[in-house]
Amino acid sequence: MSKNIVLLPGDHVGPEVVAEAVKVLEAVSSAIGVKFNFSKHLIGGASIDAYGVPLSDEALEAAKKADAVLLGAVGGPKWGTGSVRPEQGLLKIRKELNLYANLRPCSFASDALLKLSPLKSEIVKGTDFVVVRELVGGIYFGDRKEDAGDGVASDTESYSVPEVQRITRMAAFLALQSDPPLPLWSLDKANVLASSRLWRKTVEETIKNEFPQLTVQHQLIDSAAMILVKSPTKLNGVIVTNNMFGDIISDEASVIPGSLGLLPSASLASLPDTNKAFGLYEPCHGSAPDLGPGKVNPLATILSAAMMLKLSLDLVDAGRAIEQAVKNVLDAGIMTADLGGSSSTQEVGDAVAQEVAKLLKN
């Protein structure tokens, strides 16, 4: 069996973290006999420097033909905020590949990390939810008008019933993967916004008509933001929300485990009902241009690779083995500086790769 994976390392620490994830995937390959065909392409600032665009047609076509895509990080001060920006490569690939659902889990890879949270350990212990963010609609892709000298600019938040139904089905599917099903939360601003009223009505009807075994609890986004810092376990389960709210709430959630270096993400183009959804996987952290070589935490990217195995490559057991290996490595105190350790990027990657090999051979 072989799987085709496109690598988009990106900028600054991106190539470093992708290299460690590949190291772990190669350990999986050796242990279980599956072949990974890696194809590397440029994205972001690296692509701008080479081709003048943040994502080349060649890279996009390669991604379309792959089983999955693993991305590092894009951006940095070098490329500024001009008309051609590294982040445009990300927006383009999400839209072109129809990656409509962004999944960002928030949990503790090991209880050894509880002390790193900016919130009290007793408040965050047991936090375990996933934010399901609609990724190709809403205000980020709506009509916009720049200031043309009249001192007025505008952005349009727009959603259709099919767009909301599609992301609701993704959230419901994920909730049903547990027995009993996980709690389902929908976040909106229905007390003010027309688009949120359509969102709430559509989510409610979709769950009632298609997933009668589930109940959805609606929460205003500002209230949810407060709950997240006061009592995050109250939101345990699956949280579904629109593009902008999802962007903000998942960034807020990302500080709960104490380091962005721990949090993976998946962007999917279809339900992972056969564990073969096409997806793009990336760490939640940015390109960290201020970090020197060997300093970045590779675990978010390694855990993104674990999600890739489980959701896109139909290698669920191998994905779980990576997650267990990460826990074992953290429990052993092998950590980068962001977690209070003294290990280098490569040392953490080596430790996880060795642990994965051990787990899969047993």
Curated annotation (Swiss-Prot):
Which branch of life, at top level?
Answer: Eukaryota
Binding of NAD(+) occurs at 76-87, 286-297
Localization of this protein: Cytoplasm
Q: Which GO CC terms are listed, alphabetically?
A: cytosol
Q: Where does Mg(2+) bind?
A: D222, D247, D251
Show which residues form the site (Important for catalysis): Y140, K189
Catalysis: reaction(s): (2R,3S)-3-isopropylmalate + NAD(+) = 4-methyl-2-oxopentanoate + CO2 + NADH
The record's remark on the cofactor is: Binds 1 Mg(2+) or Mn(2+) ion per subunit.
Q: Does the keyword Manganese apply?
A: yes
Which Gene Ontology terms describe the biological processes this protein takes part in?
Answer: L-leucine biosynthetic process
Q: Which Pfam families does its entry note?
A: Iso_dh
Gene3D superfamilies attached here?
Answer: Isopropylmalate Dehydrogenase
Keywords for this entry?
A: Amino-acid biosynthesis, Branched-chain amino acid biosynthesis, Cytoplasm, Leucine biosynthesis, Magnesium, Manganese, Metal-binding, NAD, Oxidoreductase
Q: Which positions in this protein are listed as binding substrate? A: R94, R104, R133, D222
Give start-end of the signal peptide. Answer: none
GO function terms (MF aspect): 3-isopropylmalate dehydrogenase activity; magnesium ion binding; NAD binding
The pathway is: Amino-acid biosynthesis; L-leucine biosynthesis; L-leucine from 3-methyl-2-oxobutanoate: step 3/4
Q: What EC identifiers does the entry list?
A: 1.1.1.85
Q: Which NCBIfam families match?
A: leuB (TIGR00169)
What does this chain do? Catalyzes the oxidation of 3-carboxy-2-hydroxy-4-methylpentanoate (3-isopropylmalate) to 3-carboxy-4-methyl-2-oxopentanoate. The product decarboxylates to 4-methyl-2 oxopentanoate.
**PANTHER family for the chain:** 3-ISOPROPYLMALATE DEHYDROGENASE
Q: Which family does it belong to?
A: Belongs to the isocitrate and isopropylmalate dehydrogenases family.
Assembly and interactions? Answer: Homodimer.
Q: What is this protein called?
A: 3-isopropylmalate dehydrogenase
Organism, as annotated: Pichia angusta
Per the record, the gene is: LEU2
